[in-house]
């Protein structure tokens, strides 16, 4: 959308924040990451500040303590860089990686997967930058940024000092943090230290990731078998498959049993990343072609008795065997906002240049490239009002309105 600001400041060296005269800038000053989760409702009267600092590195500041810790190894590479590998009591091997705020988050995901490190692979292809990921607590496919954030590094505009804030102190919740509430406007995030694992920690039981991986493994096995006249693929009624190899002497051996066993034992961060990217590209618009802010609404978490009322409505409309998609969150229930929006007939609906995306109704897109902020907001409010009237649920936008 065509919106403007009075002034724009690009910071590539965080040290420049110490000498920046904030009071001389057009007010207010708004810190923006990649802008992928923002809806500017009109021209911005103040200054947009963007942290453009780049870099990903293993932390080596723990070298001193590492030498005194028999459970820690410091590995120095030929180029002089160092990584600290700390083996905890439970046997996990972790690496601390500092990523500068201006790094595109998916570039960080790609880097981690290339290194064979576990943690951000399920978050692949989420648009935006690393600094903003710590504000929004981005999440997808069963993983949230808070799960891997160790420390948030920031500039405190009040004290004019650089601070290191433990992730545990950031008040993280579902798409929430203190950076969005009590600390809003105070801190400018300059970098984030992530805690990644060098040993397998796959999270597959969300959003079809496991099913897609199993299909991928079965396709690979089938392809190999088709090129080997001595190999047979046996698929059972329960969906499990065996790859049976017949040797020249006539004996047979089972190479693999259930596909899900192969997935658990052989999956890599890169495989999960590629699978997640494939799923996202199937249902989400390409930002190079259609403008959007990604998921527009948060998925509501409601009381169980309220959920039962929604189930009753759904069964009345779709039949007694119909099952409402949901996820248990302790004693409460998370209901996909996309499902409710679809059930209310909004999928593909247009209002001016704004549209509820046909493939994923959780997304509102600038379908024509000429949508105005007013059209986006009008469509948003129509969705919210209809969901409220039908299900008694107040949807809240995930997108920040500026």
Feature-to-residue mapping (PLM):
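Anion-binding (especially nucleotide phosphate/pyrophosphate-binding) glycine-rich loop
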Residues: 1-159
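Residue-level signal for inorganic ion chemistry
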Residues: 13, 35, 128, 160, ...
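Phosphate/pyrophosphate- and phosphate-bearing ligand-binding catalytic cores of soluble enzymes
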Residues: 38, 163-219, 236, 247, ...
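Generic detector of N-terminal low-structure segments
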Residues: 60, 219-222
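A cross-taxon signal for low-complexity, glycine/charged-rich
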Residues: 64-70, 74, 79-95, 225-226, ...
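Beta-rich strand-turn-strand
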Residues: 117, 373-376
């Amino acid at each position: 959308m065509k919106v403007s600001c009075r002034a724009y400041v690009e910071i590539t060296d965080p040290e420049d924040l110490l000498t920046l005269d904030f009071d001389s800038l057009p007010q207010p000053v708004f810190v923006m990451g990649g802008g992928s989760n923002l809806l500017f409702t009109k021209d911005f009267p103040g200054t947009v500040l963007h942290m453009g600092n780049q870099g990903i590195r293993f932390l080596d500041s723990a070298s001193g303590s590492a030498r005194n810790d028999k459970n820690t190894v410091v590995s120095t590479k030929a180029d002089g860089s160092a990584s600290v590998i700390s083996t905890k009591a439970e046997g996990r091997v972790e690496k601390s990686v500092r990523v500068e705020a201006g790094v595109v988050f998916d570039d960080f995901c790609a880097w981690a997967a290339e290194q064979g490190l576990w943690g951000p692979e399920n978050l692949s292809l989420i648009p935006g930058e690393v600094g903003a990921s710590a504000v929004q607590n981005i999440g997808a496919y069963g993983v949230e940024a808070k799960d891997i954030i160790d420390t948030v590094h920031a500039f405190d505009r009040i004290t004019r000092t650089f601070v290191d804030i433990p992730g545990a102190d950031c008040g993280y919740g579902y798409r929430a943090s203190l950076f969005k509430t009590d600390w809003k406007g105070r801190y400018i995030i300059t970098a984030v230290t992530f805690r990644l694992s060098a040993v397998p920690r796959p999270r597959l039981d969300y959003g079809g990731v496991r099913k897609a991986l199993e299909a991928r493994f079965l396709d690979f096995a089938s392809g190999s078998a088709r090129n080997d006249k001595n190999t047979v693929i046996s698929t059972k009624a329960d969906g499990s498959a065996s790859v049976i190899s017949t040797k020249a002497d006539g004996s047979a051996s089972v190479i693999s049993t259930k596909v899900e066993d192969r997935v658990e034992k052989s999956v890599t961060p890169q495989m999960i990343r590629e699978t997640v990217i494939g799923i996202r590209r199937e249902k989400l618009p390409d930002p190079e072609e259609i403008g959007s802010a990604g998921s527009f609404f948060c998925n509501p978490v409601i009381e169980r008795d309220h959920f039962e009322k929604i189930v009753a409505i759904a069964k009345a409309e779709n039949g007694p065997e119909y099952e409402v998609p949901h996820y248990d969150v302790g004693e409460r229930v998370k209901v996909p906002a996309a499902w409710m929006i679809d059930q209310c007939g909004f999928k593909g609906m247009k209002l001016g240049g704004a549209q509820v995306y046909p493939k994923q109704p959780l997304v509102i897109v600038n379908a024509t490239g000429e949508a105005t902020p007013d059209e986006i907001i009008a469509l948003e409010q129509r969705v919210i009002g209809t969901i409220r009237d039908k299900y008694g649920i107040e949807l809240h936008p995930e997108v920040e309105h500026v």
